[in-house]
Amino acid sequence: MCVFHMGVKFKDIVNPEPINFKDLEGKTVALDAANIIYQFLSIIRQADGTPLMDHQGKVTSHFSGILYRTTSLIEKGMKPFYVFDGAPSVLKKSTQLKRSEIKEESRKKWKEAMENGDIQEARKYASRTSRMSTDIIQGSKQLLEFMGIPYIQANGEGEAQASYMVDKGDAWCVGSQDYDCILFGATRMVKNLTITGGKTDLELIRLEKVLSDLQISRKQLVDVAILVGTDFNEGIKGIGAKKGLNLIKQHGDVFKVLNEMDVEMEVDPQELRDLFFEHNFVSEYELKWRNPDLEGAIEFLAGEHDFSEDRVINALNKLKKLDTSQSSLEKWF
């Protein structure tokens, strides 16, 4: 029997290193766009769970998140860029269907909580209803262009492309909450890369240290994930990260574990391995941070989507740290 997981669950076997923002000064950070924008859509909401919207009824929570998160990271000395998902793997269809079912159930419970006047419950369920639409993705890219922040369009999984760019040395780390990044080969990833993050909030995960601590290879780490469950396959019921690790260390690989347990998986484990090791990466790209189009950004956020013009200008003023020759953004008006 199998069980679904939304992203691989490695919390019990991976020990992150605490770091602070000073450690990231001068570093280029690849941000997993889908992972981060989904956070914004889930968290940036009104008291009753309703997302931020403009006068047209269009969701703007992601615009707020991108504006303030990105400019804050730049103010702290980082050079962020975003990596967007391309076409999803066919192996992800079952997971996407399961997620849709969860969102629909949460939507019903959100409505019930609102009818009962239970604002706390309403907000809890509302945060689970977020959806990434084409409009949200295209709008996010448009805002980044106005801000002068580069983004990469991946062929496949954005986190895989971001991990590839870290491995190549074009970024210092991936900024994501998803442990899949180390499965894709990211040498470093940083969790909890938020505006309010302090010394104890940021977590650095180094692939080399993880493998050394667990005394396994990256291929074996992927095998553990296959047993536990990933975005691309159902895990084996009753196998968590610790048990999966012990089984792989005892038997050597996922094939021997499945043979010993006399269990068949719906997806060929070799297909899953190949997805993590032979992903369709974009190898030619340009990372160039440009001067922002202030008038365009202000018109887009304040004019079209009802943001406060003063707050937008104050946030955009932080972008001057990307170009030390500019003493003030007033020079770009």
Describe each PLM feature range:
Residues Q56-T60, K108-E112, Y179-C181, D201-L204, ...:
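Short, surface-exposed, polar/charged, turn-prone segments marking secondary-structure boundaries
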Residues D32, Y82, D178, G240, ...:
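Residue-level signature of catalytic and energy-coupling elements of molecular machines
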Residues C2-F4, V8-I13, I19, D23-D167, ...:
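Noncatalytic, basic helical substrate-engagement surface that gates or grips nucleic-acid strands
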Residues L52, Q56, K92, I102, ...:
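A sequence-level detector of short, solvent-exposed, charge-rich linear segments
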Residues C2-H5, D12-V14, I19-E25, F40, ...:
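Non-catalytic nucleic-acid-binding/docking modules located in mid-to-C-terminal regions
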